[in-house]
Amino acid sequence: MANTGDGIILGLDPGSRATGYGLVRERSGVLELVDAGVVRTTSQPDFPSRLGVIFTAVAELIQRHGPAEVSVENVFVSKNAATALKLGQARGAALAACAVAGLSVHSYEPTVIKQSLVGTGRAEKSQVAFMVARVLACRETFAVDATDALAAAVCHLNQRRLTRLCGAR
C-alpha cells in the first residue's frame, strides 16, 4: 500500500484513449503541483488492453506518490451509448486501482469543479486551465486531460477547506 502521510490528492480524468492525472498537495495553505500528465492507451491493440494500461498506470502513480485521497469528475453522459460505456469502463479501471490501494474516492460534477476554480459552472476549458495555472503557480502548459485532472484535485482540496471552515465533518 502507498504511503498516505503527505496529504497529496490524485485527480483523475479517465478516458479510453487518454487518462489525465494530476497530483496536488496543500502545505501551509498553499496548493502545490506534485506531478501531472496523461496516460495514452492508443498503442494498445484492443479495448481490454487499454483498460489494463489505465489500471496499471494509476496503480503505479499511487505507489510512487502515495496520495491520501482521489478526486474524479463524474462521467459525462454522452448521447452515444457505446462512447458512454467505454468511458465508464475506463473510469472503472482507474477507480479499481484506487480501491485496491484502499483510497477513498470523491466524485464531483463538472459544474462543481468549474465553479470551484473559476467561479462559474459554465466556464470554458481555457478558463479552467488558466485558473489551474494561477492556483498552482506553475508556468508549465499541460494537455487538456491533465488540466482537467488537476482541476479535480484542486476542487477536492477547496471542498476540504470549506468543510474545515464551516466546522462540518
Swiss-Prot record:
Catalytic activity annotation: Endonucleolytic cleavage at a junction such as a reciprocal single-stranded crossover between two homologous DNA duplexes (Holliday junction)
Pfam family for this entry, one: RuvC
Cofactor note: Binds 2 Mg(2+) ion per subunit.
Gene Ontology cellular-component annotations: cytoplasm; Holliday junction resolvase complex
Enzyme Commission designation: 3.1.21.10
PROSITE patterns in UniProt: RUVC
Family: Belongs to the RuvC family.
Protein's recorded name: Crossover junction endodeoxyribonuclease RuvC
Species this protein is from: Solidesulfovibrio magneticus (strain ATCC 700980 / DSM 13731 / RS-1)
